[in-house]
A protein has these predicted regions:
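Short, acidic Ser/Thr/Gly-rich low-complexity loop/linker segments typical of extracellular
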Residues: 51-61
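Short, ordered, surface-exposed loop/turn motifs in non-cytosolic proteins
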Residues: 25-27, 34-49, 68
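A short, solvent-exposed loop/turn motif at the edges and junctions
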Residues: 47-49, 72-85
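A short, amphipathic beta-strand motif
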Residues: 27-33, 60, 97
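Structured extracytoplasmic
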Residues: 104, 110, 114-286, 292-300, ...
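Hydrophobic beta-strand segments
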Residues: 43-47, 73, 111, 320, ...
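Exposed, low-structure sequence patches enriched in small/polar residues
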Residues: 257-259, 391-780
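Extracellular beta-sheet/turn segments enriched in Thr/Pro/Gly and aliphatic residues
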Residues: 88-114
Length: 780
């Protein structure tokens, strides 16, 4: 889910928010063709060894801000000679630059690329790319029956541009030892302070038929300011943001979006290609193939592919970055680099990959520097016993028991030489020193409560969590002010047996409510009861208020932020419920749930129950149902952010199919009514490459018997001022009740394809990820 990714990024950005802005200067001017004197659009203008810069507009003009009083201005574009000069932005000058066209020779073909007159017809670069696309699978390792490789991966987050001037700011003066941990980025050359580091050592396995991909994790290490967050949840979110990249696919997944690959089947209609020059890489002569999207706001890349000049069209190196005008939330800069080598039989092997990102929350802040580096080695195409063992496991990622507790000697022996950085590998020491200061210690505690909602009873391996804290104080029309206290046990108390509960009290109705739950897990858990996969038996008793027509998917009804309503909430009664549930989840994505439930719905002065006897109505205090329920769910390749109490999807690419049926018989175990209720649903995200994506949710349901209104189907109304998925913000609670329905929710995200074309969006830097949404609830 995109809100989860943004929240994780915002955690790191919070560290940089309070840094005062330094003096800023303006760099502006115009770029023209030296021969025609026509303005040149989409020209790269930047300060050397920094990410500060911009691209020229349609009139050739450029404008950007910098806090540097001196620097080297570099202006470059495809088909022209690069221009550079020393400038002093503090002097507030306007620069007029005329670029001279460049001429390149390649295979005795003369290419003079001119951006203003780009043509696909009879273009040697386009023909070159078409031949590359035709042969892109010829030497793919996935054409082999089997392969395996060792992987070392390191992901770091750092405060960006942590220079001497920033170190003097009041926020950091208390922590003068931070200078000991300042490093220099090998990509941007900026001083950075690493505040989070993650390392992974694993072996990847691939089998063509039957198709299977596994990863055997031998070591995993984490240290930094994000330690208080769910380890599994953060790892899932980071894996979704920094996915493995295959430039030979039609689409490249990064930052929960999909971008058109330069080697996509539709590449020649999406990109402009240029043959720039020839050069030697690893002893082989390669062509420098440059590319840029026709539309600089579209979800694609600028970059270079270095391709061997032989019949294999082998890519030795790839360099990709985002167009400057792309609007991608907090992402201000991105650089993706890949290096390939050949096996003895010519198979293409990925040797090294790095993704460098600069995140910014607001202009004027240096933000966060993030980098993921992966080194691959020890490729083999012969199956091994270890591989056979991995393929017998149901899970895709197999983690060794001691993977999280490897000693430092293990990492020192297994880190590649290029990954050895004293500052990056000293985050443990940095965090220990920071926590020695009360101001940081308590700030971290507060952030932990805000992000997780729970208070652990101990720093290491807590036996019990108190919370959720956002439900401690709330209120509604029936109860008036309401207080609640609760918590849950963890796997550190018992890895199989878990308890959860709360007690709540309303000062207006003066009634005590509560929940008591005991769950036995047949699988040993690491931290929480709801870790995937769940295989458990749970007994639960709950007595509380029932807010009819308000059932939220990802938050508690007691959330304090839901207490403020746009409409008077006077559709509230009471209920008591006892249930026993058996749940079994499988790695295939299939799960089922069997529940036996006894429920009593009780009226209140806000929701009276009346029974019609002839022409007269008599009040009914309550009614009961004894029901059995079966739920089936299938969500292959589903990925989610795991928290202490819930799961939030981090990707909607996987389809989700659901089917459930509830049955109750009048007179059976004291049930007052016969009740049959069937629900079915499907949801899926569909990607249209360069044309965005659409999210589709289809649901249908039917109550097959004549029942009182609390047992009917009520559309989910959202009376709060928050955004809640699959709820109706313009509908009131119990405004509609029905015994059958069909609903569809379709949202089409254009990825800036239309809205960002308007000048007002470009000039105001508004969010350009336009979308269209349709929602329908058909009922009877």
């Amino acid at each position: 889910m995109r809100l989860i990714i943004k929240g994780a990024v915002a955690l790191f950005l919070l560290l940089a928010i309070s840094i005062p802005l330094s003096a800023q200067y303006i760099v502006q001017g115009v770029v023209t063709d030296s021969l025609t004197r026509e303005p040149l659009s989409y020209v790269s203008v930047r300060l050397k060894n920094t990410t500060e810069g911009t691209t020229t507009g349609s009139d050739g003009r450029f404008y950007f801000k910098t806090h540097r009083s001196e620097g080297v201005l570099v202006i470059s574009t495809v088909g022209y000679n690069e221009y550079s000069r020393l400038i002093h932005p503090a002097r507030n000058l306007s620069y007029k630059v005329a670029l001279s066209p460049a001429t390149y020779a390649l295979n005795e073909v003369l290419v003079k690329p001119k951006r203003e007159h780009y043509r696909k017809k009879d273009n040697p670069a386009v023909e070159f790319v078409r031949r590359m696309i035709e042969h892109r699978d010829d030497h793919s390792p996935n054409e082999k029956d089997f392969w395996q490789r060792d992987r070392y991966e390191k992901t770091t987050f750092a405060l960006n541009n942590f220079d001497e001037e920033k170190q003097k700011k009041w926020l950091y003066r208390k922590f003068d030892f931070l200078t000991e941990y300042v490093d220099t980025s090998a990509v941007t050359g900026k001083p950075i302070l690493t505040v989070s580091a993650r390392e992974l050592l694993a072996t990847d396995y691939y089998r063509k038929s039957p198709h299977s991909e596994k990863q055997w994790v031998k070591g995993r290490k984490q240290a930094g300011v994000d330690e208080f967050l769910s380890k599994q949840g953060m790892q899932a979110a980071i894996n979704e943001v920094f996915k493995d990249v295959d430039i030979y696919e039609n689409n490249i997944s990064l930052f929960t979006n999909k971008f058109v690959s330069p080697l996509s089947r539709i590449g020649t209609g999406f990109y402009k290609y240029y043959l720039m020059d020839t050069l030697q890489i690893g002893g082989e002569t390669c062509a420098d193939l440059a590319f840029t999207p026709f539309n600089s706001e579209s979800f694609g890349f600028n970059g270079h592919l270095y391709v061997t000049l032989d019949s294999t069209y082998f890519v030795k190196r790839a360099v990709l970055n985002f167009p400057k005008k792309i609007n991608l939330n907090f992402v201000d800069y991105m650089l993706l680099e890949q290096e390939f080598k050949r096996a003895e039989d010519g198979t293409r092997l990925l040797d090294h990959e790095s993704i460098t990102v600069e995140f910014k929350l607001t202009e004027g802040q240096d933000g966060i520097f993030a980098r993921r580096v992966a080194d691959y080695s020890c490729y083999s195409f012969l199956p091994t016993e270890e591989a056979d063992k991995a393929f017998t496991k149901p899970e895709r990622i197999i983690e060794e028991t001691e993977a999280l507790s490897r000693p430092e000697t293990f990492w020192a022996e297994n880190r590649p030489q290029a990954a050895i950085s004293q500052q990056e590998n000293s985050v443990d020491r940095l965090m220990a020193q920071l926590r020695g200061y009360p101001v940081y210690y308590w700030t971290e505690k507060v952030l932990s409560i805000l992000f997780t909602g729970y208070i652990p009873t101990s720093k290491e391996a807590p036996l019990f969590y108190i919370g959720p804290m956002n439900a401690t104080i709330s209120g509604n029309t029936l109860e008036g002010p309401r207080i609640r206290a609760g918590g849950m046990t963890t796997a550190w108390l018992n890895p199989h047996l878990f308890g959860k509960g709360y007690i709540a009290y309303g000062f207006k109705d003066e009634r005590l409510k509560g929940l008591a739950e005991v769950e036995y897990s047949f699988k040993k858990k690491k931290e929480y009861a709801n870790e995937f996969p769940i295989h458990s038996l749970k007994v639960r008793y709950e007595s509380d208020v029932n807010q009819y027509g308000q059932n939220y998917l990802y938050t508690s009804k007691d959330n304090v932020f839901l207490a403020l309503k746009r409409e008077k909430d006077d559709r509230i009664g009471y209920y008591r419920q006892t249930e026993m549930t058996y749940t079994n989840e499988f790695y295939s994505g299939f799960s089922f749930q069997l529940t036996a439930r006894r429920r009593t719905d009780e009226s209140s002065y806000l929701i009276p129950f009346l029974r019609k006897d002839g022409e007269a109505y008599s009040p009914v205090k309550d009614f009961s149902t004894s029901a059995a329920e079966l739920k089936l769910r299938y969500a292959p390749n589903e990925k989610f952010f795991q928290t202490q109490w819930n799961r939030f999807p981090v990707s909607l690419d996987a389809p989700v199919f659901t089917l459930s049926h509830t049955i109750a018989g009048k007179g059976v175990l004291g049930s007052d009514y016969t009740y049959n209720h069937t629900e079915a649903g499907i949801q899926k995200r569909f990607w249209f490459s360069a044309f965005g994506y659409t999210d589709i949710i289809l649901k249908a349901g039917k109550v097959w018997d004549k029942v009182p209104f609390p047992l009917l189907i009520m559309p989910n109304a959202n009376l709060s001022y928050t955004i809640q998925p699959e709820s109706y913000s313009l509908m009131n609670a119990m405004e509609f009740m029905n015994d059958e329905y069909f609903s569809w929710d379709v949202t089409y995200f254009l990825n800036g394809g239309v809205v960002q074309s308007y000048p007002i969006v470009e000039k105001t830097e508004m969010e350009g990820n336009s979308f269209l949404s349709w929602t329908l609830w058909a009922f009877e």
